[in-house]
Amino acid sequence: CMVLCLVPITVFAAGGAKAILPGTSAQSILKIDKSRLSFAGHEWWVIGQKTDKSNNAPIITLLAVNNDFGDVPFRTGSAVPFENARRYSEDNGYYANNPSDMSQWRKPNEYAGSTLQQKMVSLAEAIPEKEQAVIRPKDITEGITGQEVKAQKLWAFSQEDSIYLYRNSCKYAAQWWTRSSNEVYGYGSWTIHPDGRSGSALNVDYDAAVRPAMELDLSSVLFISAAEHGKVADLTTPIAEYAGDEWKLTLHDSDRDDFTAKTVLVNGSVLEVEYKNAKVGDNEYISAVIKDADGSISRYTRVVQLDGTTNGTRGRAAIDLTDIDMTGKTLCVFNEQFNGDHKTDYAGALREVKLTDEIDEQFTLTPGGRYYFDLSAMNIPGTANSNLPDSTLHYV
């Protein structure tokens, strides 16, 4: 594992990708052992990519970058009895029992039910629900002793898997646990040294760092953007190119999909957009992007902050397109929760708005359908038609 110095700055320069990209570009822009993703309040190396054969979902594997998760024993143990523990005959020590919904361990270095495995469960449960929803559960069946563990959102690497880590992702700030036991003796498990070398087999009651891994399903990613200063709210300036490797996600939030928007007034280059059914509160916005003909995003802004007082769940927002050539482009408006640098954002489906007034009476007729048009308010002479659902309506 070679040492590579990383410069902690945001790099915007020609020749890179745009600082905001459609979610469909997420897997291709994230590079193994080079890209880092801010997610669930932590930073993660991208260490693997694949496609789910069952649904063609793009999947990435992540491994924690920083030693943010504390130290634990592989399994809590003591030389003397303690509550909810039992004796292991090989070393006459006492080790914590598995949770009641699991079979009990035969050796204390079994991963299922261990202190390390339960720590992974508690860390996963602390992740916000909408971020948990895009974590792909994994059945842990290999690289362990004892029973398998199903549907794990966070999990410890195996000792064998750690051998294949690259020069960046192999390093960590502390010696960290794998999930793999040392079969030479029944109360030891493997660790990895901070420099990435395969570590020692420690007694399971020793403390070492927790380093979680996870698999992320990118199907619900609406945008991927530079982790710092990537989503600059400025529609007048094209999105900058970004040569860095730190990214964050904007996830599609289906709870916002009843949001609607339409253009109701055009004054020169300024559109007045009427919106309804927006979420309000901290960090809630009406946002807009301009999409080029190829689907790429060329401009982004946050138009109105929805604090629930001045601006509520419905209202109007002015979008200034002065000096922007909209030929072949579309303007999309959406309801977004923008949470800042290195934090996951959430947004509803993009609503395309017209560059001209949208008249309420315009709609598409379905062939074979029956429609009634009431023009009574227009003072057109006619006779009431008793055969219509409303007999007060006139012939039209």
Regions found by a protein language model. Name each.
Residues 1-12:
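Sec-dependent N-terminal signal peptides of Gram-positive bacterial secreted proteins and lipoproteins
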Residues 15-396:
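Collagenous Gly-X-Y triple-helix signature in extracellular proteins
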